[in-house]
A protein has these predicted regions:
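Charge-dense, helix-prone N-terminal extensions
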Residues: 1-191
Length: 191
């Protein structure tokens, strides 16, 4: 389905906001085309695109290269249970203070606050090791030592992966895999 989504090219932040205002409620998502800095210095910036998306309840994800001069990034309506990063929560607070949030964006925040997805990454962002992982690491001292020595970004990657498990069995599997990888001093699941 992602590949079938429309590519949209806008030249600046106001044009992107206009597109979102017009289409946020009806579009399943789009690939937003970005110019690379070397090609067009006065381009739409990623941070600006994300902020405008948040204003309408949308979020960014996958990036793909188009050419030497352009790339695309997937923007879609935020799912009700999608998690909120610390950075996006800070952006939303600032945008709300500046009175730039639109009703759809405010509704997405209200939904997230009501269902708990607004806070679901707080422990991950704070690098708090959950009890199940702490106990499993304690049983394998080399894994515990390696995990503790990992850079914050590496630990956060593992903690996020574990926190996103939907079923207890999946979470237990991810905890075991994290311990096994940490014992091998693998700083990432993709190493």
């Amino acid at each position: 389905m992602r590949d079938a989504l429309e590519q949209v090219y806008v030249t600046d932040r106001p044009a992107w906001r206009r597109w979102l205002v017009q289409h946020h409620a009806s579009s399943p998502g789009i690939w937003l085309v970005f110019d690379r800095a070397t090609h067009r210095p006065d381009r739409l910036l990623y941070a600006d695109a994300v902020e405008e998306a948040l204003c309408t309840g949308w979020i960014d994800s996958t990036v793909r290269s188009l050419s030497d001069t352009q790339y695309v990034q997937l923007f879609t309506p935020r799912k009700p249970t999608s998690t909120w990063s610390r950075l996006n929560k800070e952006r939303v607070a600032r945008l709300a203070a500046e009175d730039r949030m639109l009703p759809a964006g405010l509704a997405a925040v209200a939904t997230a606050t009501a269902n708990g997805s607004w806070e679901s990454l707080d422990a991950v962002e704070a690098l708090i090791v959950p009890d199940d992982l702490a106990n499993a690491l304690a049983a394998v001292p080399v894994a515990a030592a390696n995990f503790a020595a990992f850079a914050p970004a590496s630990r956060k990657g593992y903690l996020h992966w574990i926190s996103q498990a939907k079923r207890p069995e999946t979470r237990a599997t991810r905890v075991r895999e994290t311990v096994a990888l940490a014992a091998q001093n693998q700083k990432s699941r993709h190493s």
